[in-house]
Amino acid sequence: MASLLFGRGQKLKGTVILMQKNVLDINALTAAQSPSGIIGGAFGVVGSIAGSIIDTATAFLGRSVRLRLISATVADASGKGKVSKEAFLEGLLTSIPTLGDKQSAFSVHFEWDSNMGTPGAFYIENFMQGGEFFLVSLTLDDVPNVGSIKFACNSWIYNDKKYQSDRIFFANKTYLPSATPAPLVSYRQEELKTLRGDGTGERQEWDRIYDYDVYNDLGAPDQKATLGRPVLGGSSTLPYPRRGRTGRKKTVKEPQSESRSDTVYLPRDEAFGHVKSSDFLVYILKSASQNIVPQLRSVVTLQLNNPEFNTFEDVRSLYDGGIKLPTDVLSKISPIPLFSELFRSDGEAALKFPPPKVIQVDHSAWMTDEEFAREMIAGVNPHIIKEVLSFPIKSKLDSQLYGDNTSKITKEHLEPNLGGVTVEGAIQTNRLFTPDHHDALFPYLRKINATATKAYATRTVLFLQDNGTLKPLAIELSTPHPDGDSFGPVSKVYLPASEGVEASIWLLAKAFVVVNDSCYHQLVSHWLNTHAVVEPFIIATNRHLSVVHPIHKLLLPHYRDTMNINALARNVLVNAEGIIESTFLWGNYAMEMSAVVYKDWVFPDQGLPNDLIKRGVAVKDPSSPHGVRLLIEDYPYASDGLEIWAAIKSWVEEYVNFYYKSDAAIAQDAELQAFWKELVEVGHGDLKSATWWFKMQNRKELIEACSILIWIASALHAAVNFGQYPYGGYILNRPTKSRKFMPEKGTPEYDDLAKNYEKAYLRTITPKNDTLTDLTIIEVLSRHASDEQYLGERIEGDDWTTDSVPKEAFKRFGKKLAEIEEKLTQRNNDESLRNRYGPVKMPYTLLYPSSEEGLTCRGIPNSISI
């Protein structure tokens, strides 16, 4: 009926949903009048920043916001879709039941004759002086022959004068480039050109340009020489994934380095708008780094009588009694609402951290050998362990530079604890494993040990017992030879002991291993292998895949907030003398060492089955549920991860095969080919010559590539991130530094260890000051925001595409994830699977897909959002 009535001079009714700047204003938050800047802003003052620029919804009325529809089916003389007459926002609508929190809805009417065809895009211009707003969506009702047309926008709209080209949005239809309606083709191409920019100039807050740069902004050499840091990326010696380009001016003293600033440019929509103030975790993290941490450090420094932990009970008092604070310090941070979020003050002049899960049931179970080994397959860094395939363990380091680094662990060390099995027999039956932290650390060990920290390159050998648990057999600690690196390491092997000073020595040996694991986890497993490697994908996607491209729509949820948190990390976490350098063993060499590890990064091996096979902890087996058979059968991360991996891949396969009916369609997709070419040659350009890159010529490769990317951004990041505080919040269990070497027999240090092992242990690992810093930061990192988007969810709800087949496939994906969660819960209730809860009685929940907000030790967000 609508098509019969719709003729010349008729009007199309639309509804525009937007959010006022004062609801989401990050700048206002950072400037909030509060003792602690962003923290005060991020919690609780949002409502009081009553629109310094936009006071009421009436500011949008009149001729403030102009829209014009663009036809998808009827072209003008130049071949471009016809553009309607201008229309402006009209009345404020208050009766829309689906309206989100803090959202405003406005009506709009477009003049749209039947000879204009069907709308497929629209222009929007903001003429308000100085005020940007967040455009959520436009919905057109009763469009002839179509019905409703929805445009999911989710974008900041600045004053028209800030843009060189008009802001355009497309309807939520999905098109391969070759299937784009002819009248929309040039609009699609022009928008991508806008997002690519021209590679020049310093980027401004309102810009939307995506471009690449090397990591040359970690140091501050103009401030002082010791803050200079090498450029990561652009060389074969220190290769690195690319970051987003900001165009800031270069430093004076190091022209290859970029100057730093408090705010780092992001393409505007990457600084996503959150509705609830408590969701500004990124900004909370920044404020915790810049405000709370210095206050805590000053308190500990001033406590001259108690600058160190002396007993394990002292550490536990962080959760029980708390840190007593002087009145002046308390007055500075207690008004901050974050105070009650991160700490439990209970009305006392003290800060209390929440008790980490690892000690909630048993205070001392973390010290057992079984728990030490279990955390290598069910802890926060569960994907480093690999099978020992030959003996003795060999090094891949250049022997001309570093001498013979073959392990000094012998059969005689191992066989007394193998229960009658020989080393050869254990290898043949796939029962020897190692988390090898020797090669990554050894080349930097001499430099690290020249500082206040003292460390070893470590090797650990584990035995898979008949009951399915792992048992540590030996730990090798190595230091550089005093006569030079080419002489090889000086190594000593330590064996398990349960009594006397030997038990204390063994506990320290395990601590040196965990310190190395903590550093490798934070800089490689977490930062490099999730945060850093994904950023080039985000940049390449936005530069070459239109928002209406099916692969853009598939990947978009897995990019949310990642460039944002990465920019913050470069500013306060991984920068020179930032949180990581200050509190982790690798110190000033942390990022440089991660660059050396990146040389061996292989994209296809980031997919879980390939990763397990490469590490020798699984073998291909077509008869097994996911095509691989685990050699450590009770391996919580791997067994749970394979369920999630299979669900992701099944979803991606259905999706890709719907849009690409043949392999030829992959090769013929110009946008996809440009995206992949630039990703390989520029985004990960330092590895562009590697032969392992997919050629992107068939559906199988595209399915695998998308599955791997989604896996990294969701499940892999969840596995290595959200357990940081539950496991590492108890510093005794996951120390981040070592300050002393192992005591030698006959020395005063050895005697001290024999008399008081707790004090000796605490004087060896992370000091009190750094512990408080570390705990404050990893508690924020381990939290979920209340508006977190989890795997199987989309922020647009059902409006992300009009195609019913992908919609139904996505719903099945969500349903499958719920079924998997039930299965994982059942596994955790199976007492025969000892590695799932261990001596600490802490079930492995990190790969449960869903979660509530807060510190939950579970939940798989879609993206690397914290």
UniProtKB/Swiss-Prot annotation:
Q: What class of enzyme is it?
A: oxidoreductase
Q: What does this protein do?
A: Plant lipoxygenase may be involved in a number of diverse aspects of plant physiology including growth and development, pest resistance, and senescence or responses to wounding. It catalyzes the hydroperoxidation of lipids containing a cis,cis-1,4-pentadiene structure.
Locate the residues binding Fe cation: 526, 531, 717, 721, 866
Q: What's the cofactor?
A: Fe cation
Subcellular location, record wording: Cytoplasm
Catalysed reaction equations from the record? (9Z,12Z)-octadecadienoate + O2 = (9S)-hydroperoxy-(10E,12Z)-octadecadienoate
Does the UniProt entry include the keyword Iron? yes
* GO CC terms: cytoplasm
Here the segments flagged for biased composition (Basic residues) are 242-251
| Protein name, UniProt field | Linoleate 9S-lipoxygenase
Write out the entry's keywords from A to Z.
Cytoplasm, Dioxygenase, Fatty acid biosynthesis, Fatty acid metabolism, Iron, Lipid biosynthesis, Lipid metabolism, Metal-binding, Oxidoreductase, Oxylipin biosynthesis
Q: Which residues form the Lipoxygenase domain?
A: 174-866
Biased composition annotated in UniProt, kind: Basic and acidic residues: 252-262
Q: What is its EC number?
A: 1.13.11.58
How are cofactors bound according to the entry's free-text note? Binds 1 Fe cation per subunit. Iron is tightly bound.
Assembly and binders:
Monomer.
Pathway connected to this protein: Lipid metabolism; oxylipin biosynthesis
Q: Which family does it belong to?
A: Belongs to the lipoxygenase family.
- Residue stretches making up the PLAT domain: 42-171
- GO MF terms held by the record: linoleate 9S-lipoxygenase activity; metal ion binding
Q: Give any single GO term for biological process.
A: fatty acid biosynthetic process
